[in-house]
Amino acid sequence: MAKKSMIAREVKRKKLVKKYAAKRKSLLDEFNAAKDPMERLEIHRKIQGLPRNSAPNRVRNRCWATGKPRGVYRDFGLCRNQLRQRAHNGELPGVVKSSW
């Protein structure tokens, strides 16, 4: 189980990403459309002025059951251990043990 502070930090990051997504996208579109280097520099400074945790690449996928940051399957949002345990218990519909 991950520390509660780490889980809370990730929740905060997700909220910030959602809050600033439109502003960040509009600034990036302006940046890509700008031709003048000075104009690009000014827009870049505005992008840098946004909160650091509002960047989507800072969000880490975590298991929703345990909060573990590694070995998380995107389709289920579960870490590998929880995925295996819940699949064996039949809690994940459509997931069957492989045999050939």
Swiss-Prot record:
GO-annotated cellular components: cytoplasm; small ribosomal subunit
Species: Prochlorococcus marinus (strain MIT 9215)
Gene Ontology terms for molecular function: rRNA binding; structural constituent of ribosome
Record keyword Ribosomal protein present: yes
Cytoplasm keyword on record: no
One Pfam family hit: Ribosomal_S14
Record-level GO BP terms: translation
Protein name as catalogued: Small ribosomal subunit protein uS14
Quaternary organization: Part of the 30S ribosomal subunit. Contacts proteins S3 and S10.
General function of this protein: Binds 16S rRNA, required for the assembly of 30S particles and may also be responsible for determining the conformation of the 16S rRNA at the A site.
Domain of life of the native organism: Bacteria
Keywords: Ribonucleoprotein, Ribosomal protein, RNA-binding, rRNA-binding
